[in-house]
Amino acid sequence: MTRTGREAAPPARCDVRPWAGAWNPHTLTNVAQNRSDDAAASPDAAPSGPSRIDGVDAARAIAVFGMFTVHLGVDSMGLLSPEGYAWTLHGQVRGNSSALFALLAGLSLALMTGRTEPVTGDAHRSAAVRVLTRALLIGLLGILLDLTGVPVAIILTYYAGFFVLALPLTRLRSGALWAVAGVLAVLGPPLSFLLRDTVVDPEPRTSSLSSLTEFLLTGYYPAITFMAFVAAGLAVGRTDLRSTGVRLRLLAAGAGLTVFAYGGSWLLLHPLGGLDRLVEEGTAFMGGFPIAPGMDPVLLAQLREGVMEEAESISGQVPTDSWWWLAVNTPHTGTTFEIAEAVGQALIVLVACMWLAERARWLMYPLASVGRMPLTVYTGHILVLMVIVAGDAAEWRQPWLLEWFVLGALVLATVWRLVAGRGPAEAGLAAAADGAVEIVEERRRAP
């Protein structure tokens, strides 16, 4: 959940506070960048500049707030009433926020393992110990949050598994990582379809992660889909994100992927007849309906709309009753088009956040503060939901609840960052990871 640059001895904590001496509009950002609050900091090589990029933290906060939006639902929104606007926002962040979260996890892994140049030897071993320690603790935290009984799909247990699966990829450079992401995006969806149709027995799914099959194929955040996001994030993290040229290429790639996703899906479903094939073959919620020349256009439009509504309701992977499902591009379907669209939008959000963080630092400071402690904020919102559900579940759906969650996170994270720097959960992870590295190194040195 946290990230770093190359292996480096932590710099001395800066004791300057933004209210000390003459006011400078950039003081808050400069103080924060000079603090040793990079939870994944490692001790082998000093980075050449500030260890964090505030825009990346801001993008991570947007991912967290997107998951707030999905978890709380449209009824919790007050600002975007009437309901139509709320559904528009919900549809935009559903799927995309968790994909952005996973992509930024990959980016964090790249920063923990050498930034633009993968670390090797002892440095890579130390980084791997840190990553595995974090994965273990994040996974345990995810299990504990599952036990709260809050009816949301906890991503942390999946997230921990993604870290473990991604470790071999941390030795690769950006070009190879983009190739891995592309292969996963193209081959993963049909492989998932084939395995779920012929090998994997259907099993009831809960909001918790309860089996390896769920983690890999059938869960809310299946690795066969989400590792494409992690690999893409690693590829992004292996580039020089402070370079204007790199940012422009990422922006162009994001726009291109988004156009490909929407255009490719539309071409297959409409001009090439995929949507009508789904109507004729039937779906889980409606039987097949043969389409004949001269059919009532109103009825045909209703049938097509029914198929698209079912596509919008998918959570994790498409049904296996028709290969044409792989042509859809709706959230959480795990198709090639959905992966491309989610990566494209994630790249656009990331570049926009980096641009804004450099030009409106004071405005973006609270958002970046949330992004510096995402594990703390994510855990906190689940615990608050637990209290709400235990008291009166109806309160969960009250208007303006989402806005209060977002405002509370912004205020608390900003105050905590000013006073203490690193978030409490992030500090705990960092201490545990550093301790694990020390234990491993002591055992290696022992006769």
Predicted feature locations:
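Basic polycationic patches enriched in arginine
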Residues: 3-6, 13, 17, 35
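Alpha-helical transmembrane segments and their immediate juxtamembrane cytosolic regions
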Residues: 13, 25-447
